[in-house]
Design a protein with these regions (language model features):
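Long non-globular sequence segments
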Residues: 1-118, 192-195
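Active-site nucleophile-adjacent alpha helix/oxyanion-hole segment immediately C-terminal to the catalytic cysteine
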Residues: 66, 82-88, 92-106, 111, ...
Length: 238
C-alpha cells in the first residue's frame, strides 16, 4: 500500500511549496536521494478526491522542488561532472530537458543553467515544452489503468536515478539493460520513448536502427490491460 503525494507537500511561511517527509525511523528526508526513496512509494497524487482537479498542479510543484533539490546535489558534486569535456555534462542537460518535456518547468531549470553556464553549450529546447508537455496533455493513454500525472512523477524519479527502473515484482516490461542505459546516458530519449508507448502503444526506434520500421515496438491490448499476479492492474511506469 502506497501513499498519496499530497501527504508530503505542504507550504512554508513564505507560501512556497515544500516537501516534508519522515522515514519510519524518525529521520527527515533531506537529500534528493531521500526524496526519491519517499516518492517511489507514492501510488496516487491526491489523498482526497476533492483535490483531484489540482493533481497536475501538485506534480508541477513537485517538479520544481525536485529540481531545486537536485541543484543542491549538483553543486555538492560538481567536481565529478561539471567540466567542458566531461560527458556527464550532456547527461545533466538532458535530465533538465526531460523535466521540461514532462512538466514544462522553466524557473527551476533556469536556476540550474545560471549556476552552471557550461550546460548552455549542450543543445536543448527547454522552452519548447513550456505549454506543450506530457503532463498537460489531455488525450487518454493506451494503458487505460495508467494515470498521466502519476506516470509523470514516476518518470521524474527515473530521470534523476535510473536505478529505480524495473524495481517491481510484476512489470509491463521485463528487466532491460537497454532501457536503463538509455535513461542513464540520454534521459530525454528515455522519457520520450516511454511517454509515446504509454500514450499510443507504438514507438519506432529509428534512431537506434538507422531507419524507420526496422526496430518498432507495438503494445497489444492484452499487455496494455495486463494485471499483476495478485490480480490488480499494473499502473506504474516500469
Amino acid at each position: 500500500m502506497g501513499f498519496p503525494l499530497t501527504d508530503f507537500l505542504t507550504y512554508g511561511d513564505d507560501g512556497q511549496p515544500i516537501f516534508d517527509a519522515t522515514f519510519t525511523d524518525g529521520r527527515k528526508a533531506t537529500s534528493y536521494q531521500d526524496y526519491l526513496r519517499v516518492l517511489d512509494e507514492v501510488t496516487q497524487i491526491c489523498g482526497n478526491e476533492d483535490d483531484a482537479p489540482l493533481s497536475k498542479a501538485y506534480v508541477q510543484k513537485l517538479a520544481k522542488i525536485l529540481l531545486q533539490k537536485y541543484q543542491e546535489h549538483l553543486r555538492d558534486t560538481q567536481n565529478d561532472w561539471y567540466g567542458k569535456n566531461n560527458p556527464k555534462l550532456y547527461t545533466v542537460a538532458k535530465q533538465l530537458e526531460a523535466f521540461a518535456f514532462l512538466t514544462g518547468e522553466q524557473e527551476a531549470i533556469r536556476g540550474v543553467l545560471e549556476e552552471f553556464p557550461l550546460l548552455n553549450s549542450i543543445k536543448c529546447h527547454y522552452e519548447d515544452y513550456q505549454g506543450d508537455n506530457f503532463l498537460n496533455k489531455v488525450d487518454p493513454l493506451k494503458f487505460k489503468n495508467f494515470d498521466r500525472d502519476l506516470l509523470t512523477l514516476q518518470m521524474m524519479i527515473r530521470v534523476l536515478d535510473p536505478r529505480y527502473i524495473n524495481q517491481r515484482d510484476d512489470q509491463v516490461c521485463g528487466v532491460n539493460a537497454f532501457v536503463h542505459n538509455m535513461a542513464l546516458f540520454n534521459p530525454l530519449k528515455y522519457v520520450k520513448i516511454t511517454a509515446e508507448l504509454a500514450a499510443t502503444g507504438v514507438c519506432d526506434l529509428k534512431e537506434f536502427a538507422g531507419k524507420e520500421g526496422v526496430l518498432r515496438i507495438e503494445v497489444t491490448q492484452a499487455v496494455a490491460n495486463k494485471k499483476s499476479s495478485a490480480g490488480d492492474t499494473l499502473h506504474d511506469v516500469d
